[in-house]
Amino acid sequence: SGILNNGGKVVLEDCTVNAAFYAVANQGGGSLIVNNGKFSSTAHNGNGQWAYCIRTLGEGTETVINYAEVSGVQGAVTVDSGGKVTINDGIFSTYDLSGTGNNFHGLAVLADGHAVVNGGKFYSEGHDYCVRLGDDGAAAASDPSTVELKGGYFGDMGLDKINGGTTITPAAGYKFEQLAEPIVEQST
C-alpha cells in the first residue's frame, strides 16, 4: 500500500495492491491517476480502526480513476475534506466478512468531498446503499459534499444523508441504471 502526500503526482498503470489498511491514500494536495489496476483492502471498523481501499482527502487533492477494480470490506473509494475524485470506469464493491455487516460503501463522499461518476459498476453486499453522500447526524445538514452521477451502474440508488436520507439524484440527462446482478467478491 502507499500514501501520496504533499503535492506528489503519481500515475498507477496495470498494478495490483492488496492491503490490510488503505491500498492507496492520496492527501495533502496530491494528484493520482489510475489507469487499470486491482486494489483490495481487508480493513473494517470491527477491529477498532478503518480504511477505505482508496482514499482522497484534503483541499487541492485529486484522484482520477480511468479504470480499476476496487474491493474492500469497509469500502472501496472515499473522498473527503475538500478532495475530489473522478471515476470514469471500473468495478467498486464492498463485501461482508462472515455475515458481520461490517462493510459499507462502494463510494462514500463525506465532509466536503466531491465526486464525479462518469461510469463504472458499484455494489455493496448486504446494504441498501452502494453510494453515500454526506456525514451522519447533525453534520449531515451542513455538509457541502457533492456527487454527480453522470453514468454507471449501481446496486441501488444510494443514500443522500445531506437531504434527509433520500436517494441520490442523478445529474441532468443521466437515467439511473441498476446492476443486472450483484458483484461477487473474487479471491485474489
What are these regions (language model features)?
Residues 10-14, 31-36, 60-67, 84-89, ...:
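All-beta strand scaffolds that present successive hydrophobic residues in beta-strands
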Residues 90, 118-127, 132-188:
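Extracellular/surface-exposed low-complexity segments
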Residues 81-84, 98, 172, 181:
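Polar/charged alpha-helical tracts
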Residues 1-5, 18-28, 41-57, 71-80, ...:
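Extracellular beta-strand/beta-solenoid scaffold signature
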Residues 16, 38, 69, 91, ...:
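Secondary-structure transition/turn motif
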Residues 76, 84, 114, 157-160:
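Aromatic-residue detector
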